[in-house]
Structures are given as structure tokens and as C-alpha cells.
Amino acid sequence: MDSQRPNDVSPEAMQARIQQARREAEGLKDRIKRKKDELADTSLRDVAHRSHEAIPRNQLMKTKRTLKGHLAKIYAMHWSTDRRHLVSASQDGKLIIWDAYTTNKVHAIPLRSSWVMTCAYAPSGNYVACGGLDNICSIYNLNQNRDGPTRVARELSGHAGYLSCCRFINDRSILTSSGDMTCMKWDIETGTKQIEFADHLGDVMSISLNPTNQNTFISGACDAFAKLWDIRAGKAVQTFAGHESDINAIQFFPDGHSFVTGSDDATCRLFDIRADRELNVYGSESILCGITSVATSVSGRLLFAGYDDFECKVWDVTRGEKVGSLVGHENRVSCLGVSNDGISLCTGSWDSLLKIWAY
């Protein structure tokens, strides 16, 4: 019997054990992938080419509104559930609530830190949140101080790294992701952390709450993995591999069974939770730049992706083909989102503009 304790193991021996464990893990992953490939008697792309007609390339959205008001790079935007309002965050130090119908500013909220990276609208429309390099998630109540500046209602401090993404569960709870490789669930009323989700090995860049089951959410990180989390259990229940570089964006499909990701490897990918595997890849040899943001149409047939080359590219989800590009920004498309009714797409850019697109 080996009586050697872990404390007696030399650093070299420990490193050798770690490398051996990694090799075994990679071998097991390859075996699992081969087994899944054996069971897959067809592909989504093959089925779609047999049963779905191609989407006409001349039926692309056009710019209907341009929202001007920010004075620096826009890093994030998020639609309200009322389909009319949206919030945007810029490094000019402002959080702006917009009326997308009229292009008017409803609120212009000065931020304590201009290094903002994310923002979110509560489903009720009562609150917005933001955060960034200050490591803090700041909550603002839109129903207070209507005649004066909107002030911080709550500051949620607990992350050891920058805040990369935040999404409200309801008016009482919010999820955040961070460069400290964790996600957290917070109680907004008390300002306390309820659950910490730790399993990634790189900065967590994006999260998306399941639209049909608020007990689960997904995350994408710089370890190139996407994970499905059970909020009640406080742990990851599925891990999805396929990307070859950082995952910058992740978004659930409206049905809650699938999700899309966007990565620095210049591809978007479709994963299915029930099949526990990747179903499609969206990319081409001519696309070399990374993806900053992703969203799907309400039907799930179209995938919108923001790229570093100033374009929002549109993909046919089932056939895996590029339908076209939405061109109009003069710098990186940093964020985008589809309104709840599916009629409008909003894109935000480093050119300081937001554009509303529709048919």
C-alpha cells in the first residue's frame, strides 16, 4: 500500500500526474465523440437541404431607425419585454433607455464607472442593471426620481474580476458572469450572493437564461466550453465542446432546448441539450474575424451574429448557409438583440450608434 501522502509528492511528480490525467480526459472525450458520431445517422444540414427551401437572399432587414446619443463605443444593449424600449451601455459613462419607436431617450443614467461591459433590462421593466471593470453589478430603479437623475438602487459586490454579463431572473434575483471564472445568483433586495457557480477554467463571457425554465441557464467562457447550469443544484449538469477559441456570446433558442454560441474562432455553433451534442457550424473560409454577439429570430430559423468586421451576418440555422449581411456600421458590431415580438433587430457598435432593423 502506498503510504505517500499528497504533501510528500514533489512538484514534478504532481505535474506529471496532472498531465497524465489530462491525457486520460482527452482520450475519454475522443471516445465519447466517436460514439456520438456513430449514432448520428444523419445531420441537421442534410435533413434541411432535403426538406427546407433556401431563404431568399433579397429578403433582408433594412435600417428603420438610428439611435444617436452616445459619445463613445457602445458595448452592450438589451431589449425590454414591452418590445418598445431598450437599454444601452457605452464607455461614455452613460446608460441610456431608448424609445425605439420615436428614437427618444427616456432616461440617461450617469454611471460611477465608465468602463461598462454589460447591461440588462428586468422583465417587469422596473429595473436595469449594468457592470464592467468595476467588478460590481449596479441596479437602477426606473420608477424612482423621475424628475431627477436616476440613482443606484443596489450595488452587488462579490466578483473578483470584471463583470462580463448580467441577466435578470425577476425583480428580486439576477445572474452575473465574470472574468473570475464564476457566475453568481444574487438577491437584489438584500444585496447578497445566493449561489456561486464555478466550473469554468477561463473568463465567463456570456450567460443566457432558459426562456421556458428559469431554473437553468447556459454560459460560454474563454475555456472554449459552454455549460448548462441547474440553479437549484448550484452546479453544471452538461458541458458542450466544439469551439477552438474563446466563446464570446451565447443565447438560448426560444424553445429552451437548443442554444447558439459565437466565438473568436470565427464560427457560430448550434448545440442541442437533449442530443447533448453540436448540431451545426456557421462559418466559412472567407470569414476570419471573431463573433461578438448572437441572437436568433423568434421562429429559430435565422441566426444573427455580430462580427469584428463591422457587419451583422445572417445565417440559415437549419441549412447552415449564410443568407446575407446587414451593413451600415462603421466599426465593430459589439452587441445585438431581437425584440420579443420578433419584428425588430437592434445592433450596437463601437461607432457609438444603435440601429433598429426590420423588414
Curated annotation (Swiss-Prot):
Superkingdom of origin organism: Eukaryota
Extent of the WD repeats: 69-99, 111-141, 158-187, 199-230, 242-272, 286-316, 328-358
Pfam families in the record: WD40_Gbeta
Keyword annotations: Repeat, Transducer, WD repeat
Region feature Disordered, mapped onto this chain: 1-36
InterPro entries for this protein: G-protein_beta_WD-40_rep, Gprotein_B, Guanine_nucleotide-bd_bsu, WD40/YVTN_repeat-like_dom_sf, WD40_repeat_dom_sf, WD40_rpt
Listed GO biological process terms: signal transduction
Biased composition (Basic and acidic residues): 21-36
Role played: Guanine nucleotide-binding proteins (G proteins) are involved as a modulator or transducer in various transmembrane signaling systems. The beta and gamma chains are required for the GTPase activity, for replacement of GDP by GTP, and for G protein-effector interaction.
The family this protein is said to belong to: Belongs to the WD repeat G protein beta family.
Quaternary structure (record): G proteins are composed of 3 units, alpha, beta and gamma.
Protein name according to UniProt: Guanine nucleotide-binding protein subunit beta
